[in-house]
Swiss-Prot record:
Molecular function per GO: RNA binding
Domain called PUA: residue spans: 78-154
InterPro entries linked: CHP03684, DUF1947, MCT-1/Tma20, PUA, PUA-like_sf, Uncharacterised_CHP00451
The protein's name in its UniProt record: Uncharacterized protein MJ1432
Cross-referenced SUPFAM superfamilies: PUA domain-like (SSF88697)
GO biological process: formation of translation preinitiation complex
């Protein structure tokens, strides 16, 4: 992944990012410390937000979306979708999440929400995506795409070196 542009963010821009991350995390000041160096790295596909050279989020369609590396450190307790073990091999190759593979989902999820997909055994994040149906539908549907996969273990964002 080639970086086209990279720059440090102003305090005002950092505040905006913190506000967007507060939707998912209560510990935003730990995620982005006052003395942390916050940068944006612009690639052909994404704008990656770095704190002390560690990718914590990326921007897609004007949404700030947490990276899996951040989720491994601090997993929110909302917007979670649990998938069965059989789905993992497809998700880590970039496949969208299909409804039959979903074991459980936060019923407060609405269509177009950012969601975090975890495995049923270890509850470790596997991918981050956008909900294509609400949480209740995800649990009940037996066919169709439920989540558009945006970022998964082993992709360009996962392998990004700050």
């Amino acid at each position: 992944m080639e970086i086209r542009k990279r720059y440090f963010l102003s305090k005002k821009d950092v505040k905006k990012i913190k506000k967007e991350l507060e939707v998912f995390f209560e510990n935003v000041d730990e995620i982005i410390p006052k003395k942390g160096n916050v940068e944006i790295a612009i690639t052909d596909d994404f704008e990656i937000i770095l704190v002390d050279k560690e990718p914590i989020a990326f921007k897609k369609d004007d949404k700030v979306i947490p990276t899996l590396k951040l989720l491994l450190k601090s997993l929110p307790d909302k917007n979670l979708v649990v998938v069965d073990i059989g789905a993992i091999k497809f998700l880590i190759n970039g496949a969208d999440v299909m409804a039959p593979g979903i074991v459980d989902a936060d019923e407060n999820i609405k269509e177009e929400d950012v969601v975090f997909v975890v495995d049923e055994n270890h509850k470790k994040p596997i991918c981050v995506g956008i909900a294509l149906m609400n949480g209740k539908e995800m649990k009940e549907a037996d066919k169709g795409k439920a989540i558009k996969n945006l970022h998964y273990v082993g992709d360009k964002i996962w392998n990004f070196k700050g």
